[in-house]
């Protein structure tokens, strides 16, 4: 089995010298780099599934990096984006962060600041993907619950005791305990705290939906 690939940094800048210099710097910390001179080609062809960070120049011929950033966010791209500019202003910085940038750095770029931003971005992306997978798994398990089990889950998340749940469902506490045990097994929850953490937001989301949605 081949070892997993290191995170991939997408470097988008129309200046060949800048790309070459930054690519060399980034590779020194074990990160892979893919260079792009054309932002349009990048948007069309980059790997959206892999772990990594996007480094995007603000000023490029024909299109602003801020426009590219807005397009990426609109398409649901989840890789963190580090913006670079040689002509930064407070307004430009504000617009970049408002559009979804993870970091905004001025050229000439401080090596340590850039590497720190990339390493933070990679950690952020890994955690984001892990949360997404946990949420996806939780939804899949929830879909296999019976109506009764979903009712029990909602009452657990609401903080009811076994006795209170028994009264609400018109069943004995022992029946509630059996339902809880089955629920914990089906949802692969190791503790009450884990169960609530994984499913509270989902229960709230589903409760807010109109009937039949």
List the predicted regions and their residue ranges.
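Acidic catalytic/metal-coordinating carboxylates
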Residues: 37-38, 64-67
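Active-site beta3 strand of CheY-like receiver
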Residues: 10, 49-55
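Recognition helix of helix-turn-helix DNA-binding domains
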Residues: 161-194
